[in-house]
Every structure is written in C-alpha cells, then in structure tokens.
Amino acid sequence: RQMCIRDRSQTNLFNEQFADEYDTILMLMNGSGIIGKLENLPDFFRKMKLLLRPGGCVLMDSSNLSYLFEEEDGSIVIDLAGDYYGEVDFQMQYKNVKGDSFDWLYIDFQTLSLYAAENGFTAKLVKEGTHYDYLAKLSRQA
C-alpha cells in the first residue's frame, strides 16, 4: 500500500499565520539554530507560548561553541564586548551556486536557561553529548 503525506507545509516558524497547537515541538539537528541570534529569543519564547498546549514542551538540541576559543592551557578566551560567540553567519554553497548568508545560533545551556527563565520557561538538561552538545527540554513555568 502506498503512503503519502496529505497535509504538509513549508512555514516560517515566526510567521503570524502559523498558529496550530502542539504537545511537543521537536527542534533537532542543532534546533536552536533557526532562532538566529540571542536578540530573537524573546520572540521565540513568545511564539512557543502560542504553539504549545498546556503541559507541552520543546525538545531542542544545540552545542556550546566555547571549545573553539580554548587555549592550550585549557582557559577560554572570549571577547565579552563582542557578539555572542554562538552567533554564526552561514552561507551554503554547492559547486558554483552560493546561497544567501543567514544567521544561525549555537547556544550554551546556561545561556538558554537564563533566557528561558526570563521568558516564563524552565530549561531542563535532558542529555549531554560527547562533544559540547546537549538536548534540552523547555517547558512553560507553572
């Protein structure tokens, strides 16, 4: 028997018309990336409040890029006056075809937890990976 998808859409997560409700929102394969920049986190959490049913959650993975700034002695040197070290400017290319550049956010768990708390969510560390990566569960505060 042939199976097919009957109801699909390609939608910008932040589009106002995207307003269904979900028990769980999966944001995997560095799911935090779509947020783009730290300054977009309040908008992200506002949108999650609209999309999540009561008791629902977001499962999101990301990575802490601080290891890229690690010195030989193990210290980490980050310019605190500069942009957040997990904000990355991506541009995809295949052979001679280049796409437009776009913002992508890698966020460490502590920073995610801080922004979650500031926006009415709790962040729980579900699993730590072997290379600075993690899975987090974001739930609305009661």
Identify the role of each PLM range.
Residues R1-I5:
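Short, small-residue-biased leader/transition segments that mark boundaries at the very start
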Residues Y22-P42:
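A short SAM/SAH-binding and catalytic strip from SAM-dependent methyltransferases
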